[in-house]
Each structure stands twice: as C-alpha cells, then as structure tokens.
Amino acid sequence: MVSMPNPILDAAAGVTPHRRPVWFMRQAGRSLPEYREIREGVSMLDSCFRPDMLAEITLQPVRRHDVDAAILFSDIVVPLKAAGVRVEIVPGRGPVMDHPLLTRQDIENLPILDHDVHEVAEGIGIIREELNDAQTLIGFAGAPFTLASYLVEGGPSKNHEKTKSLMHQDPESWHLLMRRLVPTIVQFLRTQIDAGVQAMQLFDSWAGFLSERDYREFVLPYSMEILAQVGDVPRIHFGVGTGELLTAMSEAGSEVVGVDWRVPLDVAAQRMVSPKVLQGNLDPAILFAGEDVMRREIARICAEADRAIAAGHATGHIFNLGHGVLPNTDPDAITRAVEIIHTF
C-alpha cells in the first residue's frame, strides 16, 4: 500500500507539500464543546496523565477541523510534575509551585526527570493508531527559560523580576538551574519521540520578556543543547513576543521557527541566520472577525511566506496562529479557517 504524502513532514524537510499544511497551537482545548465535556470534573494535570483522556483530547480537533497535525495534549509543567516537583495548575491562573526556588540549595535539590513518563507514552500509542499517514503527531515541551521562570516566580508573572534578578545577581545559580532543567526536558521529549511523535516543538512562552543580549547569554545555550539531543525528528522553536530574538532563536538548531503575529513572515525570514521553514502567524483574534477578514489575512500571510520562499529567505511554510487558540473562539470559525488555508 502506497503511503499518503504528509504535508507537515514534507514542509519541515523543505519539500513543497501537496497542500499548505496547518495546525493551531491550543487547537485541543476550551474552544471545543467536546473538550469541555470530557474535562468536566477532571483537573488539568490529571487529564495530562490519563492515557485515554489525553489521547481523546489530542484527536478531537483533528477529527473536527481537518488540520494536518495533532499536537499532543499536555502542559509545559508535566515533566516537572513527573520528576516530583509539587506543582498544580490553578484554573484562571496557571501553574503554581508549592515551593518556589528561593535559594541555591533549592536549585540544587530540584528533582531531575530520569524515567519515561509512561502515561504519556501510552497515550501517544493510542493517538498514532487513529491518525493516518498524512497526519502528523507533534510533541512538545516547555523551553528551560519558561520553566525556570515558573519555578523561580512560583507561578505566572507579569514582569519576571525574580527571574531576571536571579540571572543577573547570581548567574552561577541561574546556570545551575538551567543545567538541571535540560535533562528533564530532554527526557520528556525522548519519551514522546520513542513512543511515536513525528515532530516536536520547543515552546518558550516567556522568552519575549528578554533582551537579545540576555537571551544569548542566559538561555540560548540550553535551548541549543535540548534541540541537539532530539534531532531525529523535525524540530520547531517558538516563543511569544520574540520578534527581536528571531536571529538568536534561529541559531538554536531547529528546522522550523515559529513567528508570532507581530512580525510579517517575509520580514521574520530575513532575521534568520539561515533559511528556515516558517510557522505562523495569524493573530488568534482574527478568528472572531468573520470570514471575509479571515480570508484576507490568510491570503496576506500566505503571500508573505511565499515571497520569503521565492527570495530564498525561507525553505517552507506551515500555517499556524501567532499564539494559541483563544478559549472562546467559535470552533466553526477554526474549521472554516482551515478550509480557506488549504485553498492557498
């Protein structure tokens, strides 16, 4: 039997796919009524450790929207929880640590994940059984800076002042923290790859709060180390608000660089150190603006990507949002956006 072409994997390899591939960050989530139903009475972290549930949630948007990839349903703090860190996800707030890292001793005592997360591996097996050859399963992990910020701040932060203070005031402790996070993140990604994910995204939610200088000194070496250890699948590197960091991020070693909605894709491509596959970058709010606006913005983004490819500044394009699907997005608007994207 001849296998079907896989648009995501083709694009990630710099091969022109048979249709423009698309998936959306947070496509599995609160925008879907079937997600809200299955999550009823189950905490976020519990749902990430139930193989049947995480598989079902991962597959829901693929069935509904005809996106070209499933993104593993998980959370960036799952590897911390699996390692033994006491963390919970508080509704309306996000990940909250029982004991933020306050001292050098706290950092030295931070547990390191040294085993497979078997619940996640089992869920991946279930997902792969349902996906066809044309559909890609993408795994992901939080990047070390973002995890470090949660650990140091104790939860989400508007300014990351404790994190930046540690970086500059005690760089030795900062680098120790990053060195302790790298093996945990790599182990979590290796669990996913060994279980069958076909690509992965390193997601740096908070990197946009850093200057390029700080990013290069305190973050980039560790993201590079992680990406170097998972090179057996295509790698996507994405951060929010990282337009000024794109040059540095493109040095980290991924084939694909995600771009948020603030920077046109053809401009972003020229900031890369070498041609990359671009991922992005529709503003998630445009999904609220009606079909005519969606079509216009999708056409613009596809044209920007195509210009970058034609100029030799990029090697491909995977359509995505510039961040995650917003919780109150109409799922029918997402389905229609996918249909429109597949016409370009």
Swiss-Prot record:
One Pfam entry name: URO-D
Record carries keyword Lyase: yes
SUPFAM superfamilies xrefs: UROD/MetE-like
Protein EC: 4.1.1.37
Subcellular location: Cytoplasm
Assigned keywords, A-Z: Cytoplasm, Decarboxylase, Lyase, Porphyrin biosynthesis
Reactions the enzyme catalyzes: uroporphyrinogen III + 4 H(+) = coproporphyrinogen III + 4 CO2
PROSITE patterns from the UniProt entry: UROD_1, UROD_2
GO term, biological process aspect, one: protoporphyrinogen IX biosynthetic process
Transmembrane among keywords: no
GO molecular function, one term: uroporphyrinogen decarboxylase activity
Pathway: Porphyrin-containing compound metabolism; protoporphyrin-IX biosynthesis; coproporphyrinogen-III from 5-aminolevulinate: step 4/4
Residues the record marks as site: Transition state stabilizer: 75
Binding residue positions for substrate: 26-30, 75, 150, 205, 323
GO cellular component terms, semicolon-separated: cytosol
CDD domains reported for this sequence: URO-D
Quaternary structure, from the entry: Homodimer.
Function of the protein: Catalyzes the decarboxylation of four acetate groups of uroporphyrinogen-III to yield coproporphyrinogen-III.
PANTHER family: METHYLTETRAHYDROFOLATE:HOMOCYSTEINE METHYLTRANSFERASE RELATED, UROPORPHYRINOGEN DECARBOXYLASE
Family listed: Belongs to the uroporphyrinogen decarboxylase family.
Name of the protein in question: Uroporphyrinogen decarboxylase
Species classification: Bacteria, Bacillati, Actinomycetota, Actinomycetes, Mycobacteriales
Gene name in the database record: hemE
